[in-house]
Amino acid sequence: MVVAGLEAAEEVFIPLQPHFLALHGLSKLLDTIQWVAGRTNPALKLSGVVLCMYEASTRLAGEVARDVDEFFSLARGTNAPWSESRSLTTKIRRNIRLAEAPSFGQSVLEYAPDSNGADDYRLLAREIHALAHPDEVLPLEVPVVPHRRGTAASAAA
């Protein structure tokens, strides 16, 4: 599944928990991205890493963020698919509302629009949009589109 997705993609953003084992998983995923870019999808690039479940008060979170930043700075000027990548400025803070929302079949923007989690994802959307469209500014409020629980086709089945 991962390889098929990477073969179809042009750009990848990776969510990363700031933990040691997640860094190991990132290493394995970078190997897979390198393999796909070298064999079947030369257009594939890693645009950034988003730190999730981030707790700024922990030393580990800061160390992982520095390690990721250092890794990407060392890759500048290489031919790696992540040579222009970055650790995104927006960090998705640990927030119970993010964990609760899916159990209600809703996005965090629907379930808890005033929560830290919703705020963080709005900021992330603005940051990613600014990377692709530096001359455009998104409105401060991102509209919430309600999740559709089913379609006429699925109801008829």
Residue ranges with predicted function:
Residues 1-87:
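Conserved catalytic-core segment of NTP-binding enzymes
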Residues 94-102:
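Short, glycine-rich, amphipathic interfacial segments at transmembrane boundaries or analogous
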Residues 101-123:
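C-terminal boundary of histidine-terminating zinc-finger modules
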